[in-house]
Amino acid sequence: MSYVKDTHMVHNKSKLGNVLIVSAHDPSGAGLQADIETCQALKCYPATIVTGLTTQNTRKLSNVKNISAHDFRAQLETLLEEFSPDVCKVGLINSTDLMASLSNVITEKLPDIPLVIDPILGSGSGAKLFTEEIIEGYLQHLVPIAEIITPNLREVRLLSNGRDVVSSVDYLLGNGCKNILVTDTDPEKEIIINHLFSRVCRQETYEMKRYQGEYHGTGCTLSSAVACRLAAGMDIRSAVRSAQKYAHSAVQFAHDLGWCQKIPNRFF
């Protein structure tokens, strides 16, 4: 009997970039869902650690229920028994206990991988998601070990006690962070202006068309795209440039579901 090889059963064994995602669930499409979609679109494998459950839609956020520190640590340690991430991306983490636990695990078990932090201090609908304790948690546990953080204008000021952008960046870089991508530094303009600051390289400025309307999960999309590009082996500046182009296109082709905010189309 002759054997005919079924070519449809031949699997692509090229290595996927592995991204460890640490964030909260948002039933309306930001948070972990946005992270997962972005990773899939950019050919990376997302392994997710849940920090909390949010009660929200694109119009309002009414509650965040944090996972216990015990359950959080158990998720991490069990996953890392067999999963070897190339990058870790952190989204909403609304507990200093979880921040401390994550910092310990990263330092002890994953000291060589880049850490991408999207410091979510408010929801897209305007809800406040921080206390002074949370701000201090970022500064003590996460910012010092970050490869890059991606705050918007409001967040970078909150993290630095209300300083102007340049002073805020100097403060955060002095706190240990290697790179800072400050997004939408002039919200009143018709274009979006982002700035990348680094401890070792000159500042870069990026300008993009501002699309009309409000969008849900753009920050999650951008920061996860940065993580994916780093997982693919890009240097930080190339990763940031590529991620911004991707996120901008996802907004350009966003889904208008008739909700308060549009949903970025991550598979445009």
PLM features per residue range, with description:
Residues 68-74, 123-143:
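Conserved phosphate-binding/catalytic loop of the ribokinase/pfkB sugar-kinase fold
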Residues 158, 213-236:
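Short, small-residue alpha-helix embedded
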Residues 4-20, 34-124, 268:
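Conserved N-terminal subdomain of the carbohydrate kinase-like
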